[in-house]
């Protein structure tokens, strides 16, 4: 699967879960579980409840995603 196959969406973090997992509500009101991408983890980017984030989803499982950007 190539990078172009992934779906990018905007969302808001509504809950923090253990092991750097987050519950995110997307713009279309769906709630998914997301984890932090490796570069965000490496650079110690903090994500808190209420932050606007960009999520990358695969077409195979639309209930799990990866947080790739935190908006200011």
Curated annotation (Swiss-Prot):
GO cellular component: cytosol
Keywords: Cytoplasm, Initiation factor, Protein biosynthesis, RNA-binding, rRNA-binding
S1-like domain segment(s): 1-72
GO molecular function, one term: ribosome binding
Predominant location category: cytoplasm
Subcellular location as annotated: Cytoplasm
Family per record: Belongs to the IF-1 family.
Function: One of the essential components for the initiation of protein synthesis. Stabilizes the binding of IF-2 and IF-3 on the 30S subunit to which N-formylmethionyl-tRNA(fMet) subsequently binds. Helps modulate mRNA selection, yielding the 30S pre-initiation complex (PIC). Upon addition of the 50S ribosomal subunit IF-1, IF-2 and IF-3 are released leaving the mature 70S translation initiation complex.
Assembly notes: Component of the 30S ribosomal translation pre-initiation complex which assembles on the 30S ribosome in the order IF-2 and IF-3, IF-1 and N-formylmethionyl-tRNA(fMet); mRNA recruitment can occur at any time during PIC assembly.
Protein name per the record: Translation initiation factor IF-1
Organism encoding this protein: Buchnera aphidicola subsp. Schizaphis graminum (strain Sg)
Organism phylogeny: Bacteria, Pseudomonadati, Pseudomonadota, Gammaproteobacteria, Enterobacterales
Gene that encodes the chain: infA
């Amino acid at each position: 699967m190539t990078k172009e196959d992934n779906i990018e969406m905007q969302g808001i973090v509504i809950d923090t879960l253990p092991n750097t997992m987050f519950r995110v509500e997307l713009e279309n009101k769906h709630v998914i579980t997301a984890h932090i991408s490796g570069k965000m983890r490496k650079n110690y980017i903090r994500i808190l409840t209420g932050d606007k984030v960009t999520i990358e989803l695969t077409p195979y499982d639309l209930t799990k995603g990866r947080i790739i950007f935190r908006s200011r």
